[in-house]
C-alpha cells in the first residue's frame, strides 16, 4: 500500500474501500471481503445507514483497531455543535471504536461551522486523528479553512476522469489539504468502463478501463475509495500498484476532463432547496 501524509502528519492509505449505497444487510460481508483482499481504509457515513455493519465487520475481522484507517461523515441533519457532538459519539458507538482516523462534514449546508467546532474539540481530545470536509467547492473550502483553528486535512469531492477538479486541486494543494475522490468511476456514466482511451491504455498493461481510471487518479495525487459488492472486482480495484502510466498516458486521460459534475451542482438553487428541505 502507498500512503499520503496529511497536513498534521497522519498517514492515510491512497486506496480505500467505500460503502456508499451498500445495504446494511450486505455491508458486513462486503467489508470482510474487502479486508480479506487487503483493504485497510474503510469509508462510511451517517447517511449511509451502515456504520454498525462496518463496526461489526471490523470487530469480526480479528485485526487490531490500529490496523484500520476508519472514516465517517456527519450528515446535515446533525449539523450544529450540540447535535454534531452527540452524533459523532453515536457513530463511534456504532463503529465500535473510541476514536476515528478521519471525520468529515458531509455537505456544506446547515450550521457546519458549529459542526466543525465540535470536531475541533474532539480532535484536541485525541478522539479524532484528522478532520476535514466533503463536497466543499473551492469557495466554501477557502472560507472554512480561513476561519478554522484546525485546518481541514481532507476534502472528499466528486473526482474522476471526466471531472478532474483542476481548480479545486490547485487551491487544496496551496493550503495543504488532501483531495479524496468520491465516485471515481462516475457510476459508469459516459460509458467509462468501455471508454476507448481508457481501454486502449489499459490494454498495454493488461488492465481494465476501471483500473486505468483509478491509476490515473492515484498518479494525480488523489486518494480513491472505489466501491464494489463483488470480491473479484474489489481485487481488481486493489491491483493498482504494479503498473505506472506514462506521461503520454496521463496527458491522453487528462484530455477527457469536462470540468463539470456528472451528478449535481452544489451551486444549483434546486439542489440547495432540496438540502434545506431535510434540515
Where are these regions (language model features)?
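A structural motif
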Residues: 39, 97-100, 128, 152
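Alpha-helical scaffolding within the catalytic cores
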Residues: 1-4, 52-59, 88-90, 138-141, ...
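Acidic-and-aromatic substrate-binding clefts and catalytic sites of carbohydrate-active enzymes
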Residues: 22-25, 43-53, 77-82, 108-113, ...
Amino acid at each position: 500500500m502507498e500512503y499520503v501524509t496529511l497536513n498534521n502528519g497522519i498517514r492515510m492509505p491512497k486506496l480505500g474501500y467505500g460503502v456508499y449505497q451498500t445495504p446494511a444487510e450486505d455491508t458486513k460481508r462486503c467489508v470482510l471481503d474487502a479486508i480479506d483482499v487487503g483493504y485497510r481504509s474503510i469509508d462510511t457515513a451517517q447517511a449511509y445507514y451502515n456504520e454498525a455493519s462496518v463496526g461489526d465487520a471490523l470487530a469480526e475481522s480479528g485485526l487490531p483497531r490500529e490496523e484500520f484507517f476508519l472514516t465517517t461523515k456527519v450528515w446535515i441533519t446533525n449539523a450544529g455543535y450540540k447535535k454534531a457532538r452527540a452524533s459523532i459519539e453515536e457513530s463511534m458507538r456504532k463503529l465500535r471504536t473510541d476514536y476515528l482516523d478521519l471525520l468529515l462534514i458531509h455537505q456544506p449546508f446547515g450550521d457546519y461551522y458549529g459542526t466543525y467546532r465540535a470536531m475541533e474539540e474532539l480532535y484536541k481530545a485525541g478522539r479524532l486523528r484528522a478532520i476535514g470536509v466533503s463536497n466543499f467547492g473551492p469557495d466554501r473550502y477557502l472560507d472554512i479553512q480561513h476561519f478554522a483553528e484546525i485546518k481541514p486535512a481532507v476534502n472528499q469531492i466528486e473526482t474522476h476522469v471526466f471531472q478532474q477538479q483542476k481548480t479545486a486541486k490547485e487551491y487544496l494543494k496551496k493550503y495543504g489539504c488532501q483531495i479524496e475522490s468520491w465516485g471515481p468511476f462516475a457510476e459508469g456514466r459516459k460509458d467509462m468502463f468501455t471508454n476507448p482511451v481508457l481501454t486502449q491504455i489499459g490494454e498495454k498493461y493488461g488492465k481494465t478501463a476501471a483500473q486505468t481510471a483509478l491509476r490515473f487518479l492515484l498518479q494525480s495525487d488523489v486518494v480513491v475509495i472505489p466501491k464494489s459488492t463483488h470480491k473479484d472486482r474489489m481485487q481488481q480495484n486493489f491491483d493498482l500498484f504494479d503498473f505506472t502510466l506514462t506521461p503520454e498516458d496521463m496527458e491522453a486521460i487528462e484530455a477527457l476532463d469536462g470540468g463539470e459534475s456528472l451528478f449535481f451542482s452544489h451551486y444549483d438553487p434546486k439542489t440547495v432547496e432540496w438540502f434545506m428541505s431535510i434540515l
